[in-house]
Structures are given as C-alpha cells and as structure tokens.
C-alpha cells in the first residue's frame, strides 16, 4: 500500500497538522520525532475507570466477542518498520471487537435507551444478545448498518439532526420511563471495554510497538486504549486522529477544557461530535501524546489504498487512523517505526463510494 510506505514523496492531497497537548512532560531524545513520555501516575486514571478495568480483567470474554487479529503487514510496510492494521472486517457486522457495554449489562433494566455513535453496531449487537429485543437506539440518520441492528431485534428510533439532539432525547425518555441511559463513550465501563482493543494489540503484537493511531470522536476508544497501554508500556505513543472539521478533542486539549463546536463536518460521521465526553477528555488530557488532523481527501485516499491492498472497504471514520498515521510519518520522516492503526469501522454507505473515488 503506497500510502503507508514511509519513504516516499509527499502526496498533494495530504494536509496534516500535529497538535500536542501543552500540559505533557516530555523527555526528548535524539530528535523531535523521538518523543517518550514519562510513565503516567496511577492517580491520572480515575477510581471509576480503575474499578471498571479491574472488573474487566476478571470477567471472561463473552464467546460472541472473539479477538480480532492484527493483520500481517505484508506490503503495508517499508522495512525495517511496519504498519499493523486492526481491521473491523474480521469482526461481526464490520465493527471493531467487543464493547464496554458488555460490562454494563449486569446493571441494566430490561429496556435501554442508547445513543450509539462511535461504534453503533457493536453496541446494539452486544446489548441485543444480553437483553433480548427491548433495545432502543437513538440516531438521526439512515446508515446501512442500522438494517443489521433492526434484524437483531432492536427498535431503532431516529430523532434529531445531530448526535447531541439524539442524546438529549434519549436521556429525557430514559428519565421519564425510569430506564437506564447508556452513553456511547463517556462511561467508565464503556471506556475500559473499548480499552480491550489495546489489550488485544499488546498481547498480539510480535514486535515492539512504537505508536498506536486511534480515530477520535467522543474519545471513548482512545481513552480506553490509552488507559490500558500506558499502564503496560508508557513508551508507546497514543496518537489521536481527527478530521479537520471535527476536531473537538484537539481544541479541548489546547484550551484545557471541553470545547463545544458550533458545527461539525459529516463526512466521517462516525466521529462527528460537537463535544467530547467529560471522562474521556480528562483521560486523554493526561495520557495521550497528541492529535493529528487530516483532510477529507486524505481519508478517501486511505479508503482507496486499503481496498487496493486488502480488498477491505473502510468507512470514512474507519480510515481516519490510517490517514493520520501516514500524515504523521511523513511530517516526522519516520521510516523505522512499528505502527498500529485502529481501523474502527467498515460500514460504508454504498452511495458514498462515488464521492470517495472522486476525492482519492
């Protein structure tokens, strides 16, 4: 895959800005590209997340949620470095592995109002197995994965024009009917459930991992991965990737508080949130190493490249980390790094394929 070869000329369709949270303490070694963070203090992870992590360690993985393998690098690499994609196409219904929702099912009522966003299909799938047909998902748009959700027996209620409107409606209905509201990312169990992806990476990798690139929406996935990986190996960089026009996490880290965007771009709709979670922001502020911005053209190029290499079609949000890894490695002229990219979704809207082709 040419887009992932570290030693090639800059492509004109890439636009990259590297954002590093200003509150981090770094030890700079040989160059600006070789940055190693000091180990995070135990106090940097909240008690709630720590308790959830301990519970997750003790609780066996459900049989319905097998680990997704790291894909062998093959021609994705330029020796001596390599890129290891974590692909959703190996998982059920094109989503990435198990969800933290599995760790919440013991406290849920028989009916749940759930705003699923960062990985909507896996949330609904896992909940459907646990609780039967009494699942309600709030979301406003008509994406193809919702057909699979409905086939699982979930009732899909589409409301509002944005995720925030859908969440407000779900919270209101849950309060009125005495139900449990399940947030898609800002809950300790959800965060640590997402962190099982980090656990899989560290256990499956056959080489020393230098960096993990993670798509960022509300922040649950990257917060969970960072919470686990930084406790195991603080030298592994955790780098978030956001679209240029949906960069709520980077702006929040820059200002030291959560920032709500006036509007967000909808191309990578799986990460298009106006404001990140409170707990996810705090964890990202303490643990992650930076955020990369990429353009829509860069995302489309990564979708094309993954298809040409693996015959796997990623949705825009799923290709986000891939685009960010390339942009980062070009920016810092990285040629010998072992990189993991989280390809978080393969639920591509068929009608969007033409647009992706034109922009790639």
Regions found by a protein language model. Name each.
Residues 2-360:
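PLP-dependent amino-acid enzyme catalytic core
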